[in-house]
């Protein structure tokens, strides 16, 4: 819960910052925060410390998914951007399903702390790739609004019905996805008696469905 709160609220700050100073600097800072948060979780000795570092981790983790959309918008025309965003949506839809599978595999060879060490390592790799990324928002296209002026635009978005309909659609998907992720182990293993070693296979079937539907959506767009 702490991670999701930090993940959602921090985007409201990183968005205006990236519009003002470009994409690469916020992306670099975000990945550094993610790495520090992951190491903090891996070295925690109490649940309070884990929650704190998970929130800290989320402050950086949100930057990648958010700025990837902005960088696509910067780099492509409307039609191609829509197709590319559809591909990105497929990746982001599969991630919440694939994550528990990978985490479960890591737990078979180590403790829960190994998961966070792996996350820190992946963060280091991603940080290295930033040096090969071009800056997609040139200086001439950057906003000169103050942060508080940008925040005022959020209220305008909340009053826009078309925008809110899309928000509700995405919200409905993630509510259902996380409800399934948290509740399916009990239903499969406890209620239906599915052996634990087969649960991962059943859980992985969702990835196939999400991939096929997202690929279809990309063609329709």
Residue ranges and their predicted role:
Residues 4-12, 96-97, 207-211, 215:
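Residue-level signature of mid-helix packing/kink "hotspots" within the transmembrane helices
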Residues 8-48:
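Conserved MFS/SLC helix-loop-helix module at the cytosolic interface between two early adjacent transmembrane helices
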Residues 47, 53-94:
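Cytoplasmic helix-loop-helix junction between adjacent transmembrane helices
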Residues 49, 78, 86-131:
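Helix-loop-helix hairpin linking two adjacent transmembrane segments in secondary transporters
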Residues 136-167:
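Juxtamembrane intracellular "pre-TM" segments in multi-pass secondary transporters
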Residues 162-203:
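Extracytoplasmic gate region of multi-pass secondary transporters
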